[in-house]
Amino acid sequence: MELGKAKLLRTGLNTLHQAIHPVHGIAWTDGKQVCLTSLFSVEGEPKFGDTNVIGQFEHVLGLFWGPLCCSGSPALLAVQHKKHVTVWQLQLSALEQNKLLCTQTCEMSEPFPLLSQGCVWHPKMDVLAILTKRDASVLFSVRVDNRRVKADIKGSGLIHCACWTKDGTRLVVAIGSALHSYTWNDIQKSLVPCSFCPIFDVGGYICAIESTDEAQVAVATELPLDKICGLNAGMAFDLPNESEGLCRPSAALTVDTDYYLDRRRSCDSERSGHASSGPIDLTNLLAKHRKSDPSPLIHLRKRDNLTGTGQDSSHLILVTYERKVTTTRKVSIPGILVPDIIAFDPNGHTVAVASNTCNMILVYCITDSSMPNVQQIQLQKNERPKGVCFFTNKMLLFMIGRQKSNDPAFLPSSNTDKYILRLTAKELVFDEESTTKSESPSQHHGIRRHSENFTKEDRLSIKDLILPGGSVIVSPSSRRKLIEEVRSSDLSPVASSADFSDRASSASSVTLENYDMDHITRMASLAVAGQASRDSSRPCSPRYETSEKLYSDATPPKNSKEKNLEQLTQNMERIFTRFAEVQQCLSEIREFTQNGKKIACSYPSAYEPQYVHITCQKQLSENVYTDERRPLLLCGGRICLRVVQELFGLTVVEMMHGPMWITLVADADGFVPLTFKHKDELTIRSARRKSPARPPSGADDFPPESPKSPSMEK
């Protein structure tokens, strides 16, 4: 479902976290307006309904639904602005049908800007945690006032994110690489540090956190570039002493030399076919450059086991708070440098990990196995996940933002960016489906595999994550990689394949891939029947073995052929249908030219009615607006004005046309003297309004006279 243009935060955002209400639907924003989109399930699949705009502010950075703790009580919606939060109470009117009543119950201002996920609701009570970079506070009476209690933050680090445990007794705040735990006492309304472990360091800078169990949280840590670049930096760049021989064994900033040389020979032999996507280390290149020079200015030496510390990858870590704090799981996140999105499904015990700056989503499942597996969901090259959540245990719901092409030579100057948003769902492949696909790799296009050797210490010290299907991927090896550069590689000789992939429809832009651990296979097929290879716009999967080679198969798999032929057949059928419509129009024109009048039009079939969507903007109060959307049947491409007036209770009707509003009139037959096409979107309002109306939903620019909440003046 297309949502339109929006201006959202660039990083650290999960727009679908606490954003779905069972009655009111999905709450989302375009940066200024508060929108509700109805959501319902049909045979386990999500279906999206109408979208209504219920409010407008100067800035909206996030929307969060409160918990369903009291049956019959109005829903609570927290609206996050730049430096303050407003809490609204929403309920359907008992007097008027389809009328939503919105009342502000609480407002809280902060001296510092709020975090990207600056509001976190308690799972069982009307208690809201508000987060800035310096402070964490809890509002415990949001339906009445803004009374709150602050957490006693120890240390000088910056807060990045926080979450409540599922039992609601603990607020866990992520500061740098440490988890600060606070116990919440609802009777005393107090927030005190944990008695047995107030601070727990996970060993990496925390990007996202989510509760997974009654006393367990999952955290995602980013790739520690500062530690990698700073670790042994002095040793790596020190000039050798006279007492030191150049042959003295020392550490290096690179991966295994044999591994790099094999990769280099492989790249040299296959350079004409494609570019290498393996790890290339600058220090190794410099050390082997200019062999004729016996004394380079900087002596670069090899480190033997830098990666043995496990600091060469971003990680997903499960932390349990019981009588002591323990790390129960730890697994690497391949290909995602800054994993700032986590979504957890408590039914299937499945975790989805993504990043606002990477076009793929990884899905893990929590089990006690030493051979975990991950499913990868790949987006288009210019798409980014802005929100991820589970609709069911096998269905993921995404809010995807498509970016405009930015010049990579210039760093972004703002923490926000413009996107074109859409909602989509993707079913995960479990059990038999996953097993069947992993048995025959040659019959599936785009399946990627990678493996790595595991030391005994790694197997004993790290428990990993696995999909329910049983196919798995292990944690990072201690000796095979340092930093893996994820890049695009154009394997197909078809020059326009990347462009064609970018122009693919949004329905087919999300692809699902499986990783398993037998051996490494990478396939790329040529474009068949108008469908180009998607590998040209995808990041390459990591490489860890010295014997791995990249190759392309010019013959597409059978399943891919059948799928492409079926898609081509559907496209041809649509073209033939358009030709039939053109022929009918030409026949009518010819008849009109010969007889001087148009032939009597035949009504369309009841199975294919011709209609338009009419959205009526109504003002509920001074600052609250609502949209009522109805489909209306067309009569030969025309609309009866009297029906529109009675349907929406209007006397004089205005219709939006570009930047202006046009008052509608009727001809002698009572129809608006305009013709409309099937499924046109029309926006109307009453011409007799007392105050300036807000702009229509989805408008790019908001005029200065647009009404704003009084709280926005602060």
UniProtKB/Swiss-Prot annotation:
Residues 432-454, 531-564, 685-714 are annotated as: Disordered. Keywords: Coiled coil, Repeat, WD repeat. Residues 567-595 form a coiled coil. It holds the Pfam family WDCP. This is WD repeat and coiled-coil-containing protein. PANTHER family: WD REPEAT AND COILED-COIL-CONTAINING PROTEIN. One of its GO terms (molecular function) is kinase binding. InterPro entries: WDCP. The lineage of its organism: Eukaryota, Metazoa, Chordata, Craniata, Vertebrata. WD repeats lie at residues 55-98, 154-194.
